[in-house]
Amino acid sequence: MRYVPLAELADAVRPTTALVAFSSVQSADGRVADLAAVRAAAAAHGARTLLDATQSAGWFPLDAGAYDYTVTGGFKFLLCPRGTSFLTVTEEVQETLPKLFAGWVAAGAPWTGNYGPLEHLAPGARGFDEPPAFLSYHGAEHSLALLGEIGTDALYAHATSLAARLRAGLVERGYEVVPGESAIVSVPGLEGRQPELAEAGIAVSAPAGNLRISCHLYNTEADVDRVLEVLGHREPRPSA
């Protein structure tokens, strides 16, 4: 296994690479991967692709079928209760992926075929299923219905518009932000301001030395302006 920086991922794919596993949007700072470049590099060398869409599903347009596997935690931008997650596997790859963790719901005949050795699994994706957390997925059903009603294009436009407003406001106030068009805005070295924002009722996080602020469907321009108000202008660095 090799770990490479995000910007070098596509160039790091080699003829000996079997699988490229990466996140569409980075949890640490919100950067968006060059999805097309990584897919092209993987295809050129016959490598499989596994995309973690946890930080993008729910606001970023994605075609799951463009990747051999996708995995997604539901509790982020999909607004699902904790305990929900989703896996997609292309039909081609399903034939080569062992169903190692299949439970009774994956049986070809769940109510009769799982007493004794589990010999026959359901065809297709259901053969990978495990018993779900029923209450969590009941909540997920409604969350996903809401997002589907709004539509990914509208969610993307709303979230990235707010993020762009926040990014511009931070730059005007002297802060250095991670560039890009993500719905996640990060300011390196500002993680120490997270408690102050929390006191003001603003929920942000501070991963990997960054102040990370995410915009989604429930946020407004007033929320963005409130963040800028609390942070204020960056204090000038002391001269040497």
What are these regions (language model features)?
Residues 1-240:
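Pyridoxal 5′-phosphate
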